[in-house]
UniProtKB/Swiss-Prot annotation:
It comes from the Bacteria. It comes from Salinibacter ruber (strain DSM 13855 / M31). Zn(2+) binds at residues 301, 303, 491, 506. Transmembrane segments: none annotated. It is a peripheral membrane protein. The keyword Signal does not apply. PANTHER family: INORGANIC CARBON TRANSPORTER SUBUNIT DABA-RELATED, UPF0753 PROTEIN AQ_863. This is Probable inorganic carbon transporter subunit DabA. Keywords: Cell inner membrane, Cell membrane, Membrane, Metal-binding, Transport, Zinc. Belongs to the inorganic carbon transporter (TC 9.A.2) DabA family.
Length: 817
């Protein structure tokens, strides 16, 4: 029976909305696993997702019990929420009831032969250079390539030669769908796309990027995926259509009410503590400042980990810190020195507009040549090693002859990781990396240098330089009072042998370190022409202000400054003082961080704390080098004066903003439609990875295996894992470190300004209306009164508190907090 291809395509596109995109490990991006459900209320969405993916939508009773015993859920708040639903039992009784209800729900899913066979071929086709023997005919597309090799798969019955299978994708759909009315096609597609949401999410991501090398060479689409899966299901006797009992109800929700109540009470308790602390800080901080010009100002990413180091830097002396999206407003593709690889270095919701290359500075040509010689030697050695390991004739002799060497190296990496790290540092001192002799190509190159594949121009036009510099200062509300030194500080992690390293790097840079972006913006702002153009636009940068770039190592809290040591742009004594204070801040921040990492480091030993973080950064067996963004709970948009001196426990995204310098609301609009949305993606990924790690996370790192250099699976096969590993979320088997709360956005701005932005951007408004996030406004035109947004529109006024309570939740003895 011929089928209408346009109808099939439309039904597949509709069904694919239920599957969120999954980025490859190299550019891991945090994203809401229920991204396709955000147009629905949260409670309804998690119910639908639970039926499709089998995952929970709310924290389990063990998590609620930990929060209750730690005092994180206010008793009065919980009692009020329960009373609104006519529930009068004691919280302990309700926790026991939820325990009983949860018993037996975590049974492992039954093994599906269809999934096992299909994932084997998906891994072979989508391999990105890991396999020594790649799947043949991949250039013909997934269905055609699979059809040629399927006869050799003994798990597929009745296929002796390719001609036993439909010849084309269209014929495959016709063969399977002829028994079903058109009205059932979309539920069938939903059923099969959501059976393996990790693999289909990756295919969805890759198929929408036809310009990527792997997709161009080996094309695949969800249509081809469904053609293979439906053909396999037909051959293996698996269900084609979902059971009618699995179909989703049209309206309403029958989700258990208790978890919803407890979650809302927990979220309100956190919100109340945070707002009380902010109010108390506002009352004790004098308006205005007579501190004068600071010694230095440092701009950090809004990342929650920046809150800790910013606080400790400010305690060292006359320093100011600001928060800005970690790609520093420059939508670029970065090409590191000595490689043809190009990496996206801007948020996942932004397309690169420029290609920035690293080229040796003229005074450092000799240093670059020495580095090139060493790099060629390393490359040749790596190629030889790969050949010996993969060559059939040489591999056995190679293993016999080199076993002692590799065994000793493995023992050293395991038993003395810090020692090897110091050797690496000594090598870096002898042969510094490209950052020491290269400079970014910020000037626009001739059109002939534009990339032939994507057309991105190399460098930036003069107008773009001014635009990015002005946007950075405008969004932060920073138009005057520039220090002699301003440091744009990107961030990146340091961790070996970690498939999820990109998840610890800068999310605003697409899972890459933010140092390159910081160097670009610093170079732009140092140009005389840019500063002159900024003066004409009302941003006066003093003649003695120098812009530097740096990178915050979030694993060790070390901040490296990118400075030409032979010709530093800052006076040596000022540079030494800044570095000394940054080192002191590192020690204080490390002391704070190690308290949450279950270490044996004693309190009050900063040097030992730094050594412990450095060990974790070097240890290839360390499953938890750092916590990443675990604990994130709030996104604060406002001047640093709102939070300066307040210990936010590394749980808040901090974006600098001054409503008084943003008359038309453009800066706030950019923040709410950009960084705030990315913050919601990060928060929901941590939330769902915590509430149901089996469905939305990636399990234990100990049992993960990398497949095809694109993702991880648990054990030796199965679905691609889409979320975060347990070690990024839990302190141990019983206690969570990440508190699964939906993100609270707090914005200091006039209420009508925020409301106007929501009216113009329905997608952002839906996140609040459907309770994927909560919104509170601190209205400066109403004496900084807190007003809370009501889903669907309108505002709740919040009465002023009688006294402040601590933002940090109290912890009971013996329970990690």
């Amino acid at each position: 029976m011929p089928i209408d291809r346009s109808v099939v395509r439309a039904r597949i596109e509709n069904a694919a909305e239920y599957v969120g995109p999954l980025w490859p490990l190299r550019t891991f991006n945090a994203a809401n696993p229920l991204l396709g459900f955000e147009d629905q209320p949260f409670d309804r969405a998690v119910q639908k997702a639970g039926q499709l993916f089998g995952g929970r939508g709310y924290p389990g009773p063990t998590v609620f019990r930990q929060a209750w015993e730690n005092g994180e859920i206010d008793a009065d708040v919980l009692t009020r929420h329960l009373a609104e639903h006519g529930i009068t039992e004691r919280p302990e009784v309700l926790l026991d009831r939820m325990d009983a209800d949860a018993a037996g729900r975590d049974a492992a899913p039954a093994d599906q032969p269809l999934d096992r066979v299909l994932t084997k071929w998906l891994a072979a086709f989508l391999d990105q250079g890991q396999a020594a023997w790649p799947m043949p005919n991949r250039e013909d597309g997934f269905y055609a390539a699979w059809r040629t090799v399927a006869p050799y798969d003994g798990d597929i019955p009745g296929v002796g030669r390719p001609s036993d299978l439909p010849g084309t994708v269209v014929e495959a759909f016709e063969a399977v769908l002829e028994s079903y009315p058109e009205a059932r096609w979309e539920p069938i597609f939903v059923h099969h796309l959501t059976a393996l949401p990790g693999w289909t999410g990756f295919i969805k991501w890759r198929s929408r990027r036809a310009d990527t090398a792997w997709q161009a060479a080996h094309p695949i689409s969800l249509t081809e995926y469904l053609a293979v899966r439906l053909t396999l299901a037909d051959r293996m006797g698996a269900a084609i259509a979902p059971d009618r009992t699995d179909e989703l109800p049209a309206n309403g929700t029958d989700q258990p009410v208790l978890p919803r109540i407890w979650l809302r009470a927990w979220e309100e308790s956190y919100r109340t503590r945070l707002l009380d602390d902010l109010r108390q800080t506002q009352q004790t901080t004098p308006s205005g400042s007579d501190a004068g010009r600071p010694d230095a100002q440092l701009v950090f990413c809004i990342d929650t980990r920046s809150e800790v180091i910013r606080r400790h830097i400010e305690q060292q002396g006359p320093y100011e810190t600001h928060g800005y999206a970690g790609f520093f407003g420059v939508p670029m593709q970065h090409q590191p020195y000595g490689t043809e690889e190009r990496v996206k270095s801007c948020p996942p919701i932004v397309d690169p507009k420029h290609r920035i290359m690293e080229r040796p500075a003229e005074p450092h040509r000799a240093q670059a040549e020495r580095y090139d010689w060493w790099a060629r030697l390393q490359k040749a050695g790596a190629a030889l090693l790969k050949t010996l390991k993969k060559n059939v004739a040489a591999v056995f002799g190679f293993v016999e002859g080199s076993g002692g060497f590799f065994g000793a190296a493995m023992a050293a990496r395991t038993l003395a990781p810090s020692g090897l790290s110091r050797l690496d540092e000594a090598l870096d001192d002898w042969l510094p990396g490209p950052a020491s002799f290269c400079e970014p190509t910020v000037d626009r190159a001739p059109p002939a240098d534009a990339d032939a594949e994507d057309g991105l121009p190399v460098g930036l036009a003069d107008e773009a330089k001014v635009l990015y510099a002005e946007a950075a200062f405008r969004l932060m509300g920073w138009t005057d009072t520039f220090a002699p030194v301003v440091v744009f500080t990107g961030h990146g992690s340091q961790t070996p042998n970690n498939p999820y390293k990109a998840s610890l790097d800068c999310g605003a840079c697409a899972g890459n370190p933010g140092g390159p972006n910081a160097r670009v913006l610093a170079a732009i702002c140092n140009e005389d022409a840019v500063q002159e153009a900024l003066r004409e636009r009302g941003i006066a940068i003093p003649d003695d202000t120098v812009f530097l770039a740096g990178q915050h190592n979030t694993t060790t809290d070390e901040i490296a400054l990118f400075v030409d040591e032979d010709d530093p742009p800052v006076a040596p004594d000022a540079l030494d003082r800044l570095r000394r204070d940054l080192h002191a801040a590192q020690a204080d921040a490390a002391t704070e961080r190690v308290r949450t990492l279950n270490t044996s480091v004693d309190e009050g030993r900063p040097a030992a704390a730094v050594r412990e973080t450095e060990r974790r950064a070097a240890d290839w067996a360390e499953t938890r080098p750092e916590w990443g963004l675990a604990g994130n709970a709030a996104f604060i948009v406002g001047p640093r004066a709102l939070t300066r001196g307040l210990d936010l426990d590394g749980r808040c995204f901090l974006h600098s903003y001054d409503w008084a310098t943003d008359d038309d609301g453009t800066a706030l609009e950019n923040i709410m439609t950009g960084p705030l949305v990315v913050g919601e993606w990060i928060n929901t990924q941590y939330y769902f990875s915590t509430v149901d790690n089996a469905a939305y996370g990636s399990g234990s790192k100990v049992t993960q295996n990398v497949v095809g250099k694109l993702g991880v699976v648990q054990g030796n096969g199965g679905d691609l894992m889409s979320g975060l590993p347990l070690q990024s979320l839990k302190a141990d088997d019983e206690h969570v470190h990440h508190r699964p709360l939906r993100l609270m956005a707090l914005i200091q701005a006039p209420t009508d300004r925020v409301e106007a932005i929501l009216d113009r951007h329905a997608a952002v408004a839906h996140l609040f209306d459907h309770e994927w996030m909560h919104l509170t406004v601190m209205d400066p035109e109403q004496d900084d009164a807190f007003v809370r947004y009501k889903p669907g529109g309108g505002w709740h006024a919040r009465p002023a508190p009688d006294a402040s309570t601590a933002t940090k939740a109290p912890a009971s003895a013996g329970v990690p907090s």
